[in-house]
Curated annotation (Swiss-Prot):
Family indicated by similarity: Belongs to the IF-1 family.
Subcellular location: Cytoplasm
Keyword DNA repair attributed: no
Keyword Glycoprotein: no
InterPro entries xref list: NA-bd_OB-fold (IPR012340), RNA-binding_domain_S1_IF1 (IPR006196), S1_domain (IPR003029), TIF_IF1 (IPR004368)
Segments forming domain S1-like: 1-72
Protein name according to UniProt: Translation initiation factor IF-1
Gene transcribed to yield this protein: infA
MF GO annotations: ribosome binding; rRNA binding; translation initiation factor activity
SMART domains named in the record: S1
Main localization, broad class: cytoplasm
Amino acid sequence: MAKQSAIEQDGVIVEALSNAMFRVELENGHEITAHISGKMRMHYIKILPGDKVRVEMSPYDLSKGRIVFRYK
């Protein structure tokens, strides 16, 4: 069975939680918890509350996600 593709949406960081987790408000109004992707962590990209980010979510659990891009 083929793996379903991830859902990508834009959002804004609302607050920083512990262990590099963030609360993100998506454009549609939902709030999810998200962690930083490995490449962003590897390149020391810092994320602060108020930053606009792109979040990748699994179609199986829409309450969690992974931050894959920070807009400038």
